[in-house]
């Protein structure tokens, strides 16, 4: 109401003052002067000025030339410039601005103006218009194109939407600077843009423009262009020849689009180029050789494309390079020695290619290098010593085949290095003690190597270290007592080594520690109480050691602890009180001597064998008289004790032999019955098959509800040699229950998916296996992968299902190739709703009720229309009785972030709500594009916690996946995020059912989603 009243007042004031100005008698100058005063007063009337910057503006003055932020022409006393940048003003740009008929410069940037800009269309003398970084909206009016004097137009960082009219550039012959970046503009770039013939800077980045921008007939004709930025749109097509016409071009930024094809060969004929960024597109082919002519180029980024061929030997000719990024392509070959000519190079990133050979020592000549990233290639040989003489800040050689030892380094490197990652190589020798001299080191990762040495105690001197990762590096000796001298350490991982001794008390000094993993070593002694000082600790992994004693009860006071694993040690006693310990999964404490709940009355039961006690005095000499025992002498005593032991052994042996005979007899009978069942089952399953006594080891392919001929060549070949079709070429995926292949076993040779099940926990009885598969095959729903049959032998269990050729959600969301466009919001919503419907069917319609237990992106397959299909449902039914307690089966608990809290507690009843939790995590992944748990250099982020905090702070929109480029409806995204947080509630009863979730999602997609979400 207040806004409407203010608008009405300003409109009335505008009309009144306009009429007054027209009635004023006097000379012309007086009338013109009053127009400027009155226009600014009307303009001010629609503004909120919290800091009173415009206090000097008053209608009592005859001229505004003395007002703050106003400039006048000294000859005419007309307002020519109004600059209100960064004054925290809010409001709208009203028609009062139209009174400033001589205005040349209007700059209102970095405020919070809202509404449209239609009032600016009649300022015919305007030369500079800067409205950047406000909250203006609506379409950009084509009438701006009628301002022929306009030279500078900056609308960056607003909320303008819609398409650009061709008329906008009909009269732009004076325009030199144009920036419309960071808006919501869409459609094609107008073909009339070429009429801006003197344009030297064009920035249309971070919008939703699509199609091909008509380079030949449009942009390539802007011959005075010096800066071109079309990045972060959805532009596509190839880049044609003709860029050489932009002789003055200095900056070319086309990154984060969908351009494809080869790079234009004449790009190297723009001699003044100093910045080229073509990253994150679909460019292919080899790098044009003309690039070597770009002597002035200092920033060159073609990362995340499909470029191939050998690494260019002419790279050394581009002597001006400061930043070079060829990462995530398919480049091959060796690094040429000419790379040493890049004496100005500071940042080199060649990661994730197929480069091979040794790291050239000639790179040592690039004395200005600060960042070198060569990870994920096939480099071999030693690390050149000279690298450790440079002033590098970051060195990442991980994921190669490097051998030899780590160079010791120099004083220059000691003072500069911040991040060192040599993980996943084959390095040997000792970790040099000089590592403690890297005074600014924050991240050190030497994991997955073959050092076979001690952890250097000098690590304690790394006072700024936040991440120390020495996993699986064949380390020996003890954990250094002062390893936690650094108060900054947040992640400490020493698991998978051969460390001995006790866990030092000093580890409790790591006050910032969030992850501590010492698992799979040979550590002994008790768990130190000092661990209770680690108030920031979230993950504690001590499994597979030889730790003894009780778990300190003080650990129950750690409020941030989320995950604990102390399995396979020698621990006894009660678990500490505290939420995380009360909900521990059995697998997290198994393999100890005796751990029990603190709520249990009486002592904990120890899991140790009872000793055999033999009392030598319990067997007498007949009359059991002490005198007779004494007269027998010591020889008689020992002989009688020996005889007593012999009698026990003989009796025990007889019992064992007798029991063995009975067991073998029973087993033979059981085997005969099972073989008879198998023969009968196979004969009944396959009509027309002969009773030939086919070997059970050969197996049979059972296709349920199929018309495929049993005599088809593919089926017969598969039965004779199933492993022949299950090879690397046909492999399409891998999960916790086995590897998935595709094989032409369906009707007319159609491909089916074949999961080779991990044998150990799977039902070993054909009768049971057949029954459970037939139950699962009855589950029919558009959002479920249908089960087609199975193949069974005692040694090989295969589950045959529908083949979905479009891959899984993991590959589309987290492992997307540069050639694959990101998932749109509409597709993501379709996946969310379809997955919900599939789970609702399993929970509420299908009988028996089926819990998935393992919902995650790898188990969501997508068909050719991106419809989701849930796979791996019901696999818990195929577990043996021993493994059938699914809630305690760590096969279903692959990663922190997916597992519902109740799955970690052996005493809680688990129901369908654990799937609801996993579904909530899946929603968060789809909306944010992030993984459930993300590890950074200094810490890790749990996605559900992060989104919940951002929602409480009112910044939840910052969580949304940026690759969607804001092409989504907030009215859908926000309720979906809130629904996800409700689904991931720690208390199962607070989560909705999947049937309710389907209804909520369907309502969210309607015009009034708040009706449902207001109840959350």
Curated annotation (Swiss-Prot):
Record SUPFAM superfamilies: L domain-like, Protein kinase-like (PK-like)
Q: Which residues form the signal peptide?
A: 1-26
Cross-referenced SMART domains: LRR_TYP
Query: What is its membrane topology?
Result: Single-pass type I membrane protein
Q: Could you tell me the keywords of this UniProt record? A: ATP-binding, Glycoprotein, Leucine-rich repeat, Membrane, Nucleotide-binding, Phosphoprotein, Receptor, Repeat, Signal, Transmembrane, Transmembrane helix
A Pfam family per the record: LRR_1
- Could you say which residues bind ATP here? 732-740, 755
Phosphotyrosine PTM positions: 841, 898
Which regions span the lipid bilayer?
647-667
Primary residence: membrane
List the stretches on the Cytoplasmic face of the membrane: 668-1016
Residue ranges occupied by any Protein kinase domain in the UniProt entry: 726-1013
GO cellular-component term (any): membrane
Q: Which GO MF terms are attached to this record?
A: ATP binding; protein kinase activity
The LRR repeat units are at: 102-124, 125-147, 149-171, 174-196, 198-219, 224-245, 248-270, 272-295, 296-318, 320-342, 344-366, 368-390, 391-413, 416-438, 440-462, 464-486, 488-510, 512-535, 536-559, 560-582
Q: Does the keyword Signal apply?
A: yes
* Subcellular location(s) of the protein: Membrane
User: What InterPro entries does the record point to?
Assistant: Kinase-like_dom_sf, Leu-rich_rpt, Leu-rich_rpt_typical-subtyp, LRR_dom_sf, LRR_N_plant-typ, LRR_R13L4/SHOC2-like, Plant_LRR-RLKs, Prot_kinase_dom
Q: List the Extracellular topological domains.
A: 27-646
Instruction: Report residues carrying sugar chains.
Output: 112, 135, 171, 203, 349, 445, 464, 509, 522, 565
Cell membrane is among the record's keywords: no
Say which domain of life the source belongs to: Eukaryota
Regarding protein family, the annotation reads:
Belongs to the protein kinase superfamily. Ser/Thr protein kinase family.
Q: Which PANTHER family match?
A: LRR RECEPTOR-LIKE SERINE/THREONINE-PROTEIN KINASE-RELATED, PROTEIN KINASE DOMAIN-CONTAINING PROTEIN
Q: What is this protein called?
A: Probably inactive leucine-rich repeat receptor-like protein kinase At3g28040
């Amino acid at each position: 109401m207040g806004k409407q009243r203010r608008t009405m007042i300003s409109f009335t004031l505008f009309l009144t003052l306009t009429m007054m100005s027209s009635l004023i008698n006097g000379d012309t100058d007086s009338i013109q002067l009053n127009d400027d005063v009155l226009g600014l007063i009307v303009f001010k009337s629609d503004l909120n000025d919290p800091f009173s910057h415009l206090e000097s503006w008053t209608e009592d003055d005859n001229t505004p030339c003395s007002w703050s932020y106003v400039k006048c022409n000294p000859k005419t006393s007309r307002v020519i410039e109004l600059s209100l940048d960064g004054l925290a003003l809010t409001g709208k740009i009203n028609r009062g601005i139209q009174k400033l008929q001589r205005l040349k410069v209007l700059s209102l940037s970095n405020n919070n103006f809202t509404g449209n800009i239609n009032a600016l269309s009649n300022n015919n003398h305007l030369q500079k218009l800067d409205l950047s970084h406000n909250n203006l909206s609506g379409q950009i009016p084509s009438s701006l194109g009628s301002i022929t004097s306009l030279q500078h137009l900056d609308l960056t960082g607003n909320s303008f939407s819609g398409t650009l009219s061709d008329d906008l550039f009909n009269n732009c012959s004076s325009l030199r600077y144009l920036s419309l970046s960071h808006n919501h503009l869409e459609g094609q770039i107008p073909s009339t843009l070429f009429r801006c013939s003197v344009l030297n800077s064009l920035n249309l980045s971070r919008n939703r423009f699509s199609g091909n921008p008509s380079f030949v007939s449009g942009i390539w004709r802007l011959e005075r262009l010096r800066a071109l930025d079309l990045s972060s749109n959805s532009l596509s097509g190839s880049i044609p020849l003709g860029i050489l016409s932009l002789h003055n071009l200095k900056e070319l930024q086309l990154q984060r689009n969908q351009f494809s094809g080869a790079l234009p060969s004449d790009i190297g004929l723009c001699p003044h180029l100093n910045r080229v960024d073509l990253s994150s597109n679909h460019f292919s082919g080899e790098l044009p050789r003309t690039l070597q002519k770009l002597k002035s180029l200092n920033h060159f980024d073609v990362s995340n494309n499909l470029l191939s061929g050998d690494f260019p030997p002419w790279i050394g000719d581009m002597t001006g390079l400061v930043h070079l990024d060829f990462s995530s392509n398919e480049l091959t070959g060796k690094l040429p020695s000419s790379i040493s000519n890049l004496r100005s190079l500071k940042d080199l990133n060649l990661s994730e290619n197929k480069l091979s050979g040794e790291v050239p020592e000639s790179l040592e000549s690039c004395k200005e290098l600060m960042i070198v990233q060569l990870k994920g290639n096939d480099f071999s040989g030693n690390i050149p010593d000279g690298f450790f003489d440079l002033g590098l800040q970051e060195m990442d050689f991980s994921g190669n085949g490097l051998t030899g030892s780590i160079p010791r380094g120099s004083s220059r490197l000691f003072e500069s290095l911040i991040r060192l990652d040599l993980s996943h190589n084959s390095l040997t020798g000792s970790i040099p003690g000089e590592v403690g001299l890297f005074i600014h080191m924050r991240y050190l990762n030497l994991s997955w190597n073959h050092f076979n040495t001690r952890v250097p105690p000098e690590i304690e001197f790394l006072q700024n270290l936040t991440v120390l990762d020495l996993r699986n590096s064949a380390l020996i000796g003890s954990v250094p007592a002062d390893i936690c001298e650094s108060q900054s350490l947040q992640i400490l991982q020493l698991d998978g080594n051969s460390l001995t001794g006790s866990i030092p008390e000093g580890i409790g000094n790591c006050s910032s520690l969030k992850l501590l993993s010492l698992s799979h070593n040979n550590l002994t002694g008790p768990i130190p109480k000092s661990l209770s000082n680690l108030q920031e600790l979230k993950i504690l992994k001590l499994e597979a050691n030889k730790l003894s004693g009780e778990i300190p009860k003080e650990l129950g006071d750690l409020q941030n602890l989320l995950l604990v694993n102390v399995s396979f040690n020698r621990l006894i006693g009660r678990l500490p009180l505290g939420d995380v310990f009360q909900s521990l999964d059995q697998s997290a404490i198994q393999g100890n001597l005796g751990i029990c709940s603190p709520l249990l009355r009486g002592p904990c039961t120890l899991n140790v064998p009872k000793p055999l006690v033999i009392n030598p005095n319990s067997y007498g000499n007949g009359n059991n008289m002490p005198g007779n025992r004494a007269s027998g002498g010591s020889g008689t005593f020992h002989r009688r004790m020996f005889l007593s032991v012999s009698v026990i052994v003989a009796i025990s042996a007889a019992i064992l032999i007798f029991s063995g005979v009975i067991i073998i007899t029973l087993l033979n009978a059981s085997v005969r019955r099972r073989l008879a069942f198998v023969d009968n089952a196979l004969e009944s399953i396959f009509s027309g098959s002969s009773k030939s006594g086919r070997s059970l080891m050969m197996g049979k392919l059972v296709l349920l509800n199929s018309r495929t001929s049993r005599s088809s060549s593919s089926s017969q070949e598969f039965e004779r040699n199933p492993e022949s079709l299950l090879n690397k070429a046909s492999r399409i995926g891998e999960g916790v229950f086995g590897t998935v292949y595709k094989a032409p076993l369906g009707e007319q040779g159609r491909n089916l998916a074949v999961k080779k099940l991990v044998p150990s926990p799977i039902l070993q009885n054909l009768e049971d296996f057949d029954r459970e598969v037939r139950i699962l095959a009855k589950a029919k729903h558009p959002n479920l992968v249908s089960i087609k049959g199975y193949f069974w032998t005692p040694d090989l269990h295969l589950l045959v299902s529908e083949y979905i050729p479009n891959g899984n959600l993991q590959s589309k969301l987290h492992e997307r190739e540069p050639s694959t466009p990101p998932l749109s919001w509409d597709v993501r919503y379709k996946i969310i709703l379809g997955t919900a419907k599939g789970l609702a069917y399993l929970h509420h319609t299908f009988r028996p009720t089926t819990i998935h237990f393992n919902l995650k992106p790898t188990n969501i397959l997508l068909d050719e229309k991106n419809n989701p299909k849930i796979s791996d449902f019901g696999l818990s039914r195929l577990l043996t009785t021993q493994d059938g307690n699914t809630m305690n089966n760590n096969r279903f608990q692959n990663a922190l972030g997916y597992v519902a809290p109740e799955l970690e507690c052996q005493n809680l009843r688990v129901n369908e709500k654990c799937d609801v939790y996993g579904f909530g995590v899946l929603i968060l992944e789809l909306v944010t594009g992030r993984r459930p748990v993300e590890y950074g250099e200094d810490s890790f982020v749990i996605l559900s916690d992060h989104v919940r905090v951002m929602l409480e702070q009112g910044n939840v929109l910052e969580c949304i996946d940026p690759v969607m480029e804001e092409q989504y409806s907030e009215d859908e995204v926000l309720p979906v995020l809130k629904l996800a947080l409700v689904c991931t509630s720690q208390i199962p009863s607070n989560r909705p059912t999947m049937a309710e979730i389907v209804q909520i999602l369907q309502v969210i997609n309607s015009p009034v989603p708040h009706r449902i979400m207001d109840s959350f």
